[in-house]
Amino acid sequence: MSQASTTTLESGALLSGPRGLQYGSPAHRKEKAAAMPDSPAEVKTQPRSTPPSMPPPPPTSSQGATRPPSFTPHTHGEDGPATSLPHGRFHGCLKWSMVCLLMNGSSHSPTAIHGAPSTPNGFSNGPATSSTASLSTQHLPPACGARQLSKLKRFLTTLQQFGSDISPEIGERVRTLVLGLVNSTLTIEEFHAKLQEATNFPLRPFVIPFLKANLPLLQRELLHCARLAKQTPAQYLAQHEQLLLDASATSPVDSSELLLEVNENGKRRTPDRTKENGSDRDPLHPDHLSKRSCTLSPAQRCSPSNGLPHPTPPPPPHYRLEDMAMAHHFRDSYRHPDPRELRERHRPLAIPGSRQEEVIDHRLTEREWAEEWKHLNSLLNCIMDMVEKTRRSLTVLRRCQEADREELNHWIRCYSDSEEGKKGPTPISARSLNSCSGPEGSQLDVHRDFTPRTLSGYMPEEIWRKAEEAVNEVKRQAMSELQKAVSDAERKAHELITTERAKMERALAEAKRQASEDALTVINQQEDSSESCWNCGRKASETCSGCNAARYCGSFCQHKDWEKHHHVCGQSLQGPAAAVADPLPGQPDATASPSEAGSAGPSRPCSPGPPGPLDAAVPR
């Protein structure tokens, strides 16, 4: 069947509306048989020809006691067939029943495994949602889960293509809704409501139970692929969107692995972990072995390109109708796998369309066991090579350390001999003893050095001790040299400081002397000046009456300066004053100056009289 016909049929099955073909009629069965040549109807022994208006046939003795299914007669002149699911349990494989539900809106499943017959073409008004949702909890074969995933992906692809046929905008909205549903951001009810709002076409009522029953399988597959790719489910879905919305693409990871998680009490088990613990070969689960008979199709079991035969092939009586239907279903999709595909079947990430939709048997074949033993043998050989290389490296390192230790002992002996030579000359007796026992003594030293090492093996403590002693000796010498250099530097610094201090003191003394000389020069200049006071240096207004040369600002400065001035005062007038005193010996001179009185009494040169009044000599 081509992709276009699949899309047309499925898009027509999704929407409820008037149908031109009568469901359950011979023409309808003829058209359906022509559309699906691989239907299990080819291998059934009792084809159904009951018209929809007849009640269901009574249960036979082989089917056991079952609940009588409710049946509502229906005519097709109204709005198409009734939109509810029949009572009863479906076929364990669930392939053709759900395909017919999606395609034609009728139940065309084979006889149920557990004995409950399904209604041929009628639809009951019972709780179809609960009965359909309970299908996901039944222990179905892994291949059935793979087919359910394939149908769900085809259903979502048909939805997206139907929206794209309406308009590109609606197709984009439908694609966003599908991605949100798979990504768990939308619930099934929200998806249903928004899809109906986007397309203005209502879906059939069995779509919601179908999604509730099969959407968790697709979400588990998405989560498993995302974990293998080390991504979040949203990231993985964004990168591999074509795997979901492309009808020709296959799943990148085998979906039977995900279904095994559901069938085995929800335990997550990857292929590697299953191979390690070997739990799938546990003989305590016979029902599990009976389920494993459905993991591979008969064509794949008998394929000559699979290498060695399966260790425990199921006997021929265990083939059932499900296996035959599966062989018909996978007749085109399965081809003989090539050895390269067998080697690469455990790779989680593959190019879309490069792998077939197959179910992997986790039990190891003899070839895989041989490869495992080969890998283990190569691993052990690598470990042995590493151990041998390590042992050789340790031997070489030990020899090098022994050579270094011998050289270190030689240098230590040379150093000790040089130290003894520095301390003083060796006594004659000791020197003769050393000369007599030269080679023998050296041999004894070597024997003494190596005897405990040969007894105790490798002793690094002595080497470290001698090396530390040599290093400490070098440190001591370096410290002594450093102390000498520091002391010399300190001595030179002190000498330099002393020299600079002496220079500074001499400079200060010279500056003080120069300052005193400058002060004396200023004083002398002030004394020579006739405009300033000889005592204080201020502007002079009076003149000494004795010498008529000294200038003072007042009588206070004159009396203050008299102790120094009386030595020079009147010397220039001493001769004329004596000549004046001779012709007038008896005349009292009321205005005689102190210099004249001093000259009159030469016997008292050191006790001059008080200075005369200034106003007598200074004109007013």
Swiss-Prot record:
Entry GO CC: Golgi membrane; nucleolus; nucleoplasm
Molecular function terms from GO: chromatin binding; transcription corepressor activity; zinc ion binding
Residues covered by region (Mediates interaction with PRKAR2A): 462-483
Coiled-coil positions: 465-520
Region (Nervy homology region 2 (NHR2)) location: 371-389
Region feature Disordered, mapped onto this chain: 1-84, 112-140, 256-321, 334-354, 419-447, 577-620
Comp. bias regions, Polar residues: 1-10, 118-139, 292-306
Start-end of Low complexity biased regions: 590-604
Matches recorded under InterPro entries: CBFA2T1/2/3 (IPR013289), CBFA2T3 (IPR013292), NHR2 (IPR014896), TAFH/NHR1_dom_sf (IPR037249), TAFH_NHR1 (IPR003894), Znf_MYND (IPR002893)
Bias-annotated ranges (Pro residues): 49-60
Gene Ontology BP term (one): granulocyte differentiation
Tissue specificity as recorded in UniProt: Widely expressed with higher expression in heart, brain, lung and spleen. Expressed in hematopoietic cells (at protein level).
Region: Mediates localization to the nucleus, residue numbers: 1-412
Keywords: Coiled coil, Differentiation, Golgi apparatus, Membrane, Metal-binding, Nucleus, Phosphoprotein, Repressor, Transcription, Transcription regulation, Zinc, Zinc-finger
Segments forming MYND-type zinc fingers: 533-569
Region (Interaction with ZBTB33): 120-217
SMART domains on file: TAFH
Family stated for the protein in its record: Belongs to the CBFA2T family.
Domain remarks in the Swiss-Prot or TrEMBL record: Nervy homology region 2 (NHR2) mediates homo- and possibly heterotypic oligomerization by forming a four-helix bundle tetrameric structure.
Subunit description: Heterodimer with RUNX1T1 and CBFA2T2. Interacts with ZNF652 and ERBB4. May interact with PRKAR2A, PDE7A and probably PDE4A. Interacts with PLXNA1, PLXNA3 and PRKAR1A. Interacts with HDAC1, HDAC2, HDAC3, HDAC6, HDAC8, NCOR1 and NCOR2. Component of a TAL-1 complex composed at least of CBFA2T3, LDB1, TAL1 and TCF3. Interacts with ZBTB4, ZBTB38 and ZBTB33. Interacts with HIF1A and EGLN1.
Protein name: Protein CBFA2T3
Organism: Mus musculus (Mouse)
Gene: Cbfa2t3
